[in-house]
């Protein structure tokens, strides 16, 4: 099973922490892929940031789906 974790802000350091935590508890047959958008807010602190990040998250899911997709997506925020 492949699960894609999406950190909706652009912090690569936070994305790496999220991935490490998920891998610690994932089963042996679970592949964890963690991503964050290249463009968007560095932190989600307002309604504007949330709306901006939501578009970036949708684009990440669409791109992943077009490339073969994952079995599930987890948005690590909101």
Language model segments and positions:
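N-terminal glycine-rich anion-binding loop in soluble enzyme alpha/beta folds
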Residues: 1-56
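Glycine/small-residue-rich loop that forms an oxyanion/phosphate-binding "nest" at active or ligand-binding sites
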Residues: 53-78
């Amino acid at each position: 099973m492949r699960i894609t974790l999406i950190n909706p802000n652009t912090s690569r350091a936070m994305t790496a922490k999220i991935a490490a935590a998920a891998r610690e508890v994932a089963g042996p047959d679970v592949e964890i892929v963690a991503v964050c958008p290249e463009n968007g807010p560095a932190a989600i602190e307002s309604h504007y940031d949330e709306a901006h990040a939501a578009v970036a998250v949708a684009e990440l899911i669409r791109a992943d789906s077009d490339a073969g997709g994952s079995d599930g997506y987890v948005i690590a925020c909101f």
